[in-house]
């Protein structure tokens, strides 16, 4: 009963990203990504710094099909004792959990759905590692508008008003480039 032709998960490196086909889940996932170091002056820890992984993706499952721009953050805090760690955690801005991500193409907001990721934490009395973020999901025709846009603006919304920020021109252009690369694959 062992078949030479049994289905298996395949991963293919394309020109700009990676395509994974899973016959067991009947799913297709395409991913291309870039690492950004965001430095902003808002928040109680000023200026705050964080590394964002920006992932442009296509995902097709029996339940859904979408194109997306995903933000993942990682942060490690260190303190000499528990009390100092508690103060650091309280001062950490709420921007790391994405509540909304707005893309404006030629002055018009693109229709999208935002999914927030639950924070994952690994904490001891002197260190705290955490991961967070979210994803804006688009239909193909709206996603294509990003690559064709003559003017493009993007705004990230975290969980409070201190956590909103506009992406700078070079960051927007990098994401536009990732979108174009994904569509080209």
Each language-model region and where it sits:
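A generic "folded-domain core" signal
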Residues: 1-185
């Amino acid at each position: 009963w062992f078949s030479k032709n049994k289905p298996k998960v395949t991963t293919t490196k394309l020109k700009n990203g990676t395509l994974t086909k899973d016959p067991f889940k009947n799913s297709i996932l395409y991913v291309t990504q870039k690492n950004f170091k965001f430095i902003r002056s808002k928040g109680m820890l000023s200026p705050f710094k964080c590394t964002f992984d920006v992932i442009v993706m296509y995902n097709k499952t029996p339940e859904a099909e979408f194109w997306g721009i995903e933000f993942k953050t990682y942060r490690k805090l260190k303190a000499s004792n528990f009390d100092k760690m508690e103060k650091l955690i309280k001062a950490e801005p709420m921007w790391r959990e994405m509540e909304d991500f707005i893309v404006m193409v030629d002055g018009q907001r693109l229709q999208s759905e935002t999914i927030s990721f639950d924070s994952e934490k690994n904490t001891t009395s002197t260190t705290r590692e955490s991961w967070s973020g979210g994803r804006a999901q688009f239909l193909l025709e709206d996603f294509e508008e990003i690559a064709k846009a003559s003017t493009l603006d993007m705004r990230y919304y975290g969980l409070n008003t201190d956590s909103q920020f506009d992406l700078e021109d070079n960051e927007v252009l990098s994401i536009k480039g990732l979108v174009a690369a994904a569509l080209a694959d």
